[in-house]
Structures are given as C-alpha cells and as structure tokens.
Amino acid sequence: MSLLQTIESGRNQKPRRVMLYGVHGIGKSTFGAMAPKPVFIQTEDGLGNLDAARFPLAESFDDVMAAVMALYSEAHDFQTVVVDSADWLEQLIWKEVIRRRPTTDRGRDITSIEDYGFAKGYTYALEPWREVLDGLNALRNERGMMVILIAHAKIERFENPETDAYDRYSPRLNKHASALIQEWCDEVLFATGTA
C-alpha cells in the first residue's frame, strides 16, 4: 500500500479537551456541570449548590491520580471529567514535586517550589503535570470522555512587540504549566462578565 492510500479525510470525532478560565463567580463550574454526564475531580471546595457528581475533595496529587485511574478502570456512564480547578491542582503538584525531590542538588532542604532556584521547581512540576494530562488523554482516547479543566484568571502585563504594552487576563498558572496545558487543549476559553 502506498503512503497516499493511507490518507484519511473527514472529521476526527474524538471528545474535546477544553480549558475554561475566567473571573471569580462567572460560572466556570456551572459550565462544567452543564456538560454531558459530568463528574468533577475537585481540587478546591467550590461547587457549592451545584447538583453534580463529584469525587471527595482531593488533598494530594495522589488523590487526583486515583480519581483519574478510577474513571479509567472502573465501569461508569460519565461522559465528561471536569477538573475544578487547575490552579488549585497546581498547588498539589508543587507539593508532589517537593515530596519527590525533598532536597536541592546540594542537599539543602526544600520547603517551597521556589527553593530549587532559577525556576527549576516549576520545570520539575511539568513532569507531574504531564502525568495528569496523560491520564486525562487516556480517559479521552480510551473511555470516550470529554475533558474540561477549570481555572481562575489573573491579570498580567503583556509586552507586545508590535503595539504598546497592555494588561490581559491569563490562567492563574505558572507560565510553563499554562503553556503546556494550552498546547494540549483543543479549546482555551475565557469567561468574563463584561459586555
């Protein structure tokens, strides 16, 4: 068979990978709850009065991965997994990095992601982030589940080389993690209440 005979056409009908970030109280979790048959992996206690299926509040990276593994390996009828929220998950990931690497290369004890120096901690954090994304990819590719990552927004200064600098909203994540997640997602959506 020639390489030209292997060309496929048409749409790829895989479930979507979505990140929705926005200002506080805009309805990000409500958006996730309106997805087809959602189940929430909570990393923050913010679902309030939403009537939605949810795992108990994750207090560690292992709790998050256990929820992903349960959705992968056990029978269920959920169609969407909602991680609420990515920025609170990042805090759990930083704790996991410190658990995995409790000292610097020079033997100094680590108590904060900043203690590694030269942004090494944030680079180390990309490994557990990839583990999470790999697990979510398995849910999407092998279990047919849509993935929604909820994140809060922050305002940051953007130095545009073609125009004047300006403030803009971005996900409240470290820039390396944010870039990794945004590249992984099919859609990156922003929600605001301004008209």
For each predicted feature, which ranges?
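A short acidic, glycine-rich active-site loop
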Residues: 109-130, 170-174, 178
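Conserved P-loop
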Residues: 2-97
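Alpha-helical scaffold elements adjacent to nucleotide-binding pockets in ATP/GTP-utilizing enzyme cores
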Residues: 67, 89-92, 135, 180, ...
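Catalytic-core regions built around general acid/base machinery
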Residues: 131-143
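Loop/turn-to-beta-strand initiation segments
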Residues: 77-80, 142-149
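Short, basic, glycine/proline-bearing loop/turn elements
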Residues: 12-18, 50-57, 114-124, 161-165
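Phosphate-binding/switch region of NTP-binding enzymes
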Residues: 147-195
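Conserved P-loop NTPase nucleotide-binding/switch module
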Residues: 83-121, 161-164
